[in-house]
């Protein structure tokens, strides 16, 4: 009988196929390599001149974008250390909606500099402690770098300036058009207390054709579908909304009817017709000009709706119905009836129009303020429209963040250089080995303006030297002008960064880097194979019909 030799180390009590990495070289340096490799893919997408990435996900959907959050989400990265950075970017996206690329680049730069310090003999714990100390100091300095505070969130001109930077990094050359659209939409739907602004009140309707410059914003809602009946428009309309199909209900059991003569046959359907007409007439008598239903419209009901000049619109999504009720101020009805006047909604204009080759129903409130605004995005291709949508989404989230905290910092890399300068001098005075890590934190902050300059085709070392020279002379707002390829005053050019966004990005990037540095072992169990087939998703509503 063959002798069985026991395995050594972790393999003794782990399943066959499990992997185990231990120590600085195997675990820490491997993790750092993975994170820096991830950041090198994303770095070229940073800033106004950032390059686009073409990503094809697992269901073969094509994405052409420079939005870091979208790229990382669709890549489905498996490396556990890289996943920690991705989780940090997801948190940034969820809370602020912008600066996701900043988190990845800064975290990877911190890890890259940490690798050099570890090779020089410092322990990962000492490096992590130094980074945390430097981040604490950076967050202490940051409030003193605030250059402006957004106070009037209902002034379109001011709001447009605040949103331009968030859009420029995604849609270079279209920032003025998109900033104008988003500013109008946000100001239109902003409640009396701007703190209660809801991003869900800004809807997006994407229609292929023409160009981005023909995009427009309107106070109301747009649905990518036509009207059900013959009536195509209604002015100053009362609107009745139903959550049920606008049709005759069928009984579950089948009945048999004995008809003995022609009169009985005629009278059999006459009662049904008169009942339907009574219902539609009662609705018309209440002044209703538009009926919106969640299900299909029956032929008999459509006939009488046309007869009484009532427009019929079908919406298949319950979410669309809810938003429409909020827009027009209607109370949805669970069954077909003539609702009381106070339960009806009102809209200045409801019409079916053609945008490009698409029929759309437009609920237009011709007023300065409203509950819901829709941005109609035009573009030459689906991927182009999707990318503009992401820029709009970032801008709306920026507006939301400004309503919570209106502080603004100088953009174009100005705040990073000023922080790096301050932390460098702080590190020189710090005792102990942490001072090396604090200085490296300052160097890591330089990576962000360096990436802006690099992507704009500018000489990075020369640009950073000029920036430092300006900041040493007391010009705290000196940033990179990617248009003229020189150093300029970011505030004078209305280039701002969100204080809340930058603060959270520094915190998340430092936490992610410190977490990865404190890992000295990676233990990976063998992946499970086989097993029962997972259940498919439950039946849900249809998609939002082109609405985002």
From Swiss-Prot:
It comes from the Eukaryota. InterPro entries: Chap_CCT_theta (IPR012721), Chaperone_TCP-1 (IPR017998), Chaperonin_TCP-1_CS (IPR002194), Cpn60/GroEL/TCP-1 (IPR002423), GroEL-like_apical_dom_sf (IPR027409), GROEL-like_equatorial_sf (IPR027413), TCP-1-like_intermed_sf (IPR027410). One of its GO terms (cellular component) is chaperonin-containing T-complex. Transmembrane segments: none annotated. Its main location: cytoplasm. Keywords: ATP-binding, Chaperone, Cytoplasm, Nucleotide-binding. Residues 528-548 are annotated as: Disordered. It is found in: Cytoplasm. GO terms for biological process: protein folding. GO terms for molecular function: ATP binding; ATP hydrolysis activity; ATP-dependent protein folding chaperone; unfolded protein binding. CDD domains: TCP1_theta. Molecular chaperone; assists the folding of proteins upon ATP hydrolysis. Known to play a role, in vitro, in the folding of actin and tubulin. Required for correct subcellular localization of pgl-1. Belongs to the TCP-1 chaperonin family. Heterooligomeric complex. This is T-complex protein 1 subunit theta. It comes from Caenorhabditis briggsae. The gene is cct-8.
């Amino acid at each position: 009988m063959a002798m069985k030799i026991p395995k050594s180390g972790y393999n003794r009590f782990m399943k066959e196929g499990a992997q185990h990495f231990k120590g600085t070289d195997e675990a820490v340096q491997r993790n750092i390599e993975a994170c820096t490799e991830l950041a090198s893919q994303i770095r070229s997408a940073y800033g106004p001149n950032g390059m686009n990435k073409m990503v094809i996900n697992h269901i073969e959907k094509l994405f052409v974008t420079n939005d870091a959050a979208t790229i990382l989400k669709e890549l489905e990265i498996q490396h556990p250390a890289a996943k920690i950075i991705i989780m940090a970017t997801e948190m940034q996206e969820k809370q602020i909606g912008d600066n996701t690329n900043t988190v990845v680049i800064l975290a990877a730069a911190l890890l890259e500099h940490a690798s050099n310090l570890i090779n020089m003999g410092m322990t990962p714990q000492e490096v992590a402690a130094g980074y945390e100390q430097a981040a604490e100091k950076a967050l202490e300095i940051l409030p003193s770098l605030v250059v402006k505070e957004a106070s009037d969130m209902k002034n379109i001109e001011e709001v447009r300036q605040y949103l331009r930077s968030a859009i420029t990094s995604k849609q270079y050359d279209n920032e003025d058009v998109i900033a104008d659209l988003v500013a109008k939409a946000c100001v239109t739907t902003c409640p009396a207390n701007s703190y209660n602004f809801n991003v869900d009140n800004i809807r997006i309707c994407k229609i292929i054709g023409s160009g981005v410059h023909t995009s427009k914003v309107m106070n109301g809602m747009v649905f990518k579908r036509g009207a059900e009946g013959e009536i195509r428009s209604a002015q100053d309309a009362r609107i009745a909304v139903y959550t049920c199909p606008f049709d005759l209900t069928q009984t579950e059991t089948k009945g048999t009817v004995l008809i003995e003569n022609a009169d009985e046959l005629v009278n059999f359907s006459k009662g049904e017709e008169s009942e339907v007409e009574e219902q539609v007439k009662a609705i018309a008598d209440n002044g209703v000009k538009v009926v919106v239903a969640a299900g299909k419209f029956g032929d008999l009901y459509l006939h009488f709706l046309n007869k009484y000049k009532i427009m019929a619109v079908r919406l298949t999504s319950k979410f669309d119905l809810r938003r429409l009720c909020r827009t027009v101020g209607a109370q949805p009805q669970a069954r077909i009836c003539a609702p009381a006047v106070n339960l009806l909604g009102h809209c200045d204009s409801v019409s079916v129009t053609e945008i490009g080759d698409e029929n759309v129903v437009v609920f237009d409130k011709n007023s300065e303020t409203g509950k819901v605004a829709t941005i109609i995005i035009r573009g030459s291709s689906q991927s182009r429209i999707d990318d503009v949508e992401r820029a709009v989404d970032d801008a709306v989230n920026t507006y939301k963040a400004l309503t919570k905290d209106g502080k603004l910092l100088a953009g174009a890399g100005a705040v990073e250089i000023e922080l790096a300068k301050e932390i460098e001098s702080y590190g020189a005075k710090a005792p102990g080995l942490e001072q090396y890590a604090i200085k490296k934190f300052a160097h890591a902050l330089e990576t962000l303006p360096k990436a802006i300059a690099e992507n704009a085709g500018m000489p990075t070392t020369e640009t950073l030297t000029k920036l430092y020279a300006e900041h040493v002379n007391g010009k705290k707002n000196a940033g990179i002008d990617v248009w003229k390829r020189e150093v300029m005053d970011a505030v004078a050019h209305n280039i701002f960064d969100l204080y809340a966004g930058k603060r959270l990005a520094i915190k998340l990037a430092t936490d992610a880097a410190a977490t990865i540095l404190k890992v000295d072992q990676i233990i990976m169990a063998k992946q499970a194979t086989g097993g029962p087939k997972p259940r498919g998703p439950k039946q849900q509503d249809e998609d939002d019909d082109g609405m985002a």
